[in-house]
């Protein structure tokens, strides 16, 4: 009798498990990506900073902060590529710089993205915000284009193709490039939402954006609050459905044009950039409040980070006069190879798994998101998926952090310069900044400087003392690791993969030539 009851119980439980539409173990996931937000712009990361960010600080107090987090690139497009694919951006056909608003799609439809991974594992997936990974515009004629198209050739009455919906997103709503790059239109599920009715530009110090066609429903200073409004609508709708959701929310701010709305102008007492950061903080607070109000906070993971360091458009001189430094204690800023260009604020709140107020000092990279999600879902990635993505899940508790597998991290600048970091040491394979700060590439700034740069970030976080030549064994080891990372097409364990051809020139790409 007992045996019969046992089998009936097991059968009943199996029936419930096999027929349950929603797996409550799978967390909802919201990934908020700020644009050009400096490490030192958030109070919890820079206590001497002068911008008040109470809501992001609150998010941090409810979760975990990562003090040694890095974007895979120091500029926009490449970092986004790395987040969505778990692959270093320089393995793609874009070896340096960024795309513009009319560029073709960068991510192949054949490549797994975090959205397609989650969609295939029962998630409802959404993208709302700044895309900046290219999509294919419909043209007025049959002209073929490989890289980017002239604005006057675009047919704004037809749908785009090879956009977010083809890369795993069930729902998509956003604009193509940065908010200073035309065309200025919203695209919802491949369809342009408004008619072009004007050509506009702005030449203001902070409000600057390029001249271009603009849709009737597109107002620059309303874009950021509009995206948050759409995000609220998505979350409210999807949380009622019988499946977990993933929302990728890449903001167009505080990147140029720097346009705080009424109520926030002058709020910081510093300048428009600081006002804009405070406005973003407010929106993040409203998003966090919504999750609490819907009673889904316990098993909702919220990630907040930035795509790279702060841009000089923030007006560093004026901010410094008021004792605020967007890069905090670090050297450099957006576009370069120094820490201020790629060390970013990084927060994860997930009450079900993360103890509030936690801190991790381990080095992580924005490419690690795919590996983390695969680990959470207990999904084994295929050999060509997430090739540079190491699960951060072990870092969510002190007991398991010994299982974190990332041994080194590679950094990349706007002009294609590289650096590699392992432990305390960072080895930069150029004698300049690789970007916009001193010493500038292609200038006389680097004359007389050593070929490479080596810094001990533990003793010299500001990268002020070049140790190149003083530690030959460390340098040799780091060069070997870098060479293997290039030639193996991956940094995770697995079969050798191929890096993509250079684009649009298709010339041979060989960063190892710097060692000859």
What are these regions (language model features)?
Residues 2-5, 18-453, 461-494, 499, ...:
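Formylglycine-dependent sulfatase
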Residues 4-13:
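Sec-dependent N-terminal signal peptides
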Residues 458:
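Phosphate-moiety recognition in structured ligand-binding domains
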């Amino acid at each position: 009798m007992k045996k019969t009851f046992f089998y009936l119980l097991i059968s009943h439980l199996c029936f419930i498990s096999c027929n349950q539409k929603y797996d409550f173990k799978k967390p909802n996931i919201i990934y908020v990506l700020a644009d050009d937000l400096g490490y030192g712009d958030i109070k919890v990361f820079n206590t001497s900073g002068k911008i008040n960010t109470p809501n992001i600080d609150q998010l941090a107090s409810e979760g975990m902060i990562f003090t040694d987090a890095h974007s895979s690139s120091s500029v926009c497009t490449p970092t986004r590529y790395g987040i969505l694919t778990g692959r270093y951006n320089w393995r793609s056909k874009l070896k340096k710089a960024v795309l513009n608003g009319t560029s073709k799609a960068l991510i192949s439809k054949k490549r797994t993205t975090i959205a397609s991974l989650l969609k295939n594992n029962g998630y409802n997936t959404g993208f709302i915000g700044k895309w900046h990974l290219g999509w294919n515009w419909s043209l007025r004629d049959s002209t073929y284009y490989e890289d980017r198209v002239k604005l006057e050739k675009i047919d704004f009455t037809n749908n785009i193709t090879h956009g977010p919906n083809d890369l795993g997103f069930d729902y998509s709503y956003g604009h193509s490039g940065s908010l200073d790059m035309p065309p200025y239109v919203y695209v919802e599920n491949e369809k342009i939402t408004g008619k072009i009715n004007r050509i506009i530009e702005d030449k203001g110090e902070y409000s600057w954006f390029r001249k271009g066609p603009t849709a009737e429903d597109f107002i620059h200073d309303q874009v950021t609050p509009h995206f948050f409004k759409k995000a609220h609508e998505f979350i409210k709708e999807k949380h009622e459905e019988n499946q977990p959701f993933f929302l990728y929310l890449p903001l167009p701010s505080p990147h140029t044009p720097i346009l705080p709305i009424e109520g926030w102008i002058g709020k910081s007492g510093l300048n428009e950039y600081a006002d804009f950061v405070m406005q973003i903080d407010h929106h993040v607070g409203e998003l966090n409040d919504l999750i609490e109000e819907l009673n889904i906070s316990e098993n909702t993971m919220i990630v907040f980070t930035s795509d790279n360091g702060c841009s000089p458009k923030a007006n560093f001189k004026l901010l410094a006069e008021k004792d605020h430094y967007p890069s905090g204690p670090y050297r450099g800023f957006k576009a370069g190879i120094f820490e201020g260009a790629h060390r970013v604020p990084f927060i994860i709140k997930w009450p079900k798994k993360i103890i509030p107020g936690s801190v991790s000092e381990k080095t992580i990279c924005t490419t690690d998101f795919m590996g983390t999600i695969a680990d959470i879902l207990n999904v084994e990635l295929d050999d060509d998926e997430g090739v540079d993505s190491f699960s951060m899940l072990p870092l969510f508790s002190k007991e398991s952090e010994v299982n974190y597998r990332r041994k080194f991290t590679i950094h990349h600048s706007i002009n294609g310069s590289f650096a590699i970091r392992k432990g305390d040491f960072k080895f930069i394979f150029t004698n300049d900044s690789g970007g916009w700060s001193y010493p500038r590439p292609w200038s006389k700034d680097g004359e007389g400087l050593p070929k490479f740069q080596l810094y001990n970030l533990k003793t010299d976080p500001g990268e002020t003392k070049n140790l190149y030549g003083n530690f030959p064994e460390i340098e040799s080891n780091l060069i070997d690791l870098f060479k293997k990372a290039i030639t193996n097409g991956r940094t995770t364990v697995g079969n050798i993969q191929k890096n993509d051809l250079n684009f649009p020139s298709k010339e041979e790409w060989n960063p190892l030539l710097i060692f000859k």
